[in-house]
Amino acid sequence: MTHSYGYRRQTRKKFAKAYKTKGHVRISRYLTTYKVGEYVDIMVDGSQHKGMPYKLYHGRTGKVFNVNPRSIGVIVHRIVNGRYIEKRLHVKIEHVRPSNVKTALSKRYQANDQAKAEGNKAGKRVSTKRNPGQPLEAVQVQGAVNFQHPKVFREIF
């Protein structure tokens, strides 16, 4: 028997809820306020079938462009034929959570500003570029302290 090509195909693990989190949605999901221009993460809740986005958008970060009483309009960028297309989705609140993108970005900006201020006081120029992890420095390996050479045994015929 051939497999189906349904709307929720191959989502058994993707939409599964974590251990001890099954059941109803917590009230904090509904009480969170969203404003136009905020960044949100689309995380599909498999127990809520209404307003569920397509599986491709699970885990994507988007920008809120519309707020309704029970749903949120989110702009997500999707690659189609080698170019980015702006997709506008309306997703129910159960499938959305606030994103930490802005908080991480603002922390980095504050650290950069502080480093620049310290550099100006010292009269040095500070680079705020993010560098990839550099290779480890060379280390000389030393032998064990109590190393004993192998003993010579006589041959057995």
Swiss-Prot record:
Region listing for Disordered, in residue ranges: 110-132
PROSITE patterns per record: RIBOSOMAL_L21E (PS01171)
Protein's recorded name: Large ribosomal subunit protein eL21
Gene: RPL21
InterPro entries recorded: Ribosomal_eL21, Ribosomal_eL21_CS, Ribosomal_eL21_sf, Translation_prot_SH3-like_sf
Keyword Ribonucleoprotein carried by entry: yes
GO molecular-function term, one example from the UniProt record: structural constituent of ribosome
SUPFAM superfamilies the UniProt entry points to: Translation proteins SH3-like domain
Native source species: Tetrahymena thermophila (strain SB210)
Record-stated family: Belongs to the eukaryotic ribosomal protein eL21 family.
UniProt keyword annotations, A-Z: Ribonucleoprotein, Ribosomal protein
GO CC list: ribonucleoprotein complex; ribosome
Transmembrane segments annotated in the record for this chain: none
Gene Ontology BP terms: translation
